């Protein structure tokens, strides 16, 4: 397998060319200017799915899919001098067993006290982030509260049949995680 990569403004760009015996076509590798300004980052869709309840362990299991948008021609590059500039996703208190997957290239994930952060660059376009976790609960009901770092355009909440879901006074507010 052959690939082409380049580093521009401290950001790695690359393209896989596959198995090639002869190259006759022009190869184009798109690179972008970079910025630590997160104004162009948004969450186009967030789907929160309550998948099951383990009543013996008092744990609710959740699967989430977030579509991250970078609506610019500039790669978002967190400022290394400002740790809070990384993309952060808040999770409910008492979360356990966090697993994360994404189509973001060359990133790592770090668990923080209130959720997790993405260590890496966000290239222009839409990217998917899938994560699952459990929430330990101590009462007969669980109060599920989330905060977002970025504008959220569309929210879907899905519940498995055995879970009673109430959205009393549902209100969305964008807050820093």
What residue spans do the PLM features occupy?
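Lumenal/extracellular ectodomains and adaptor appendage modules
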Residues: 1-177
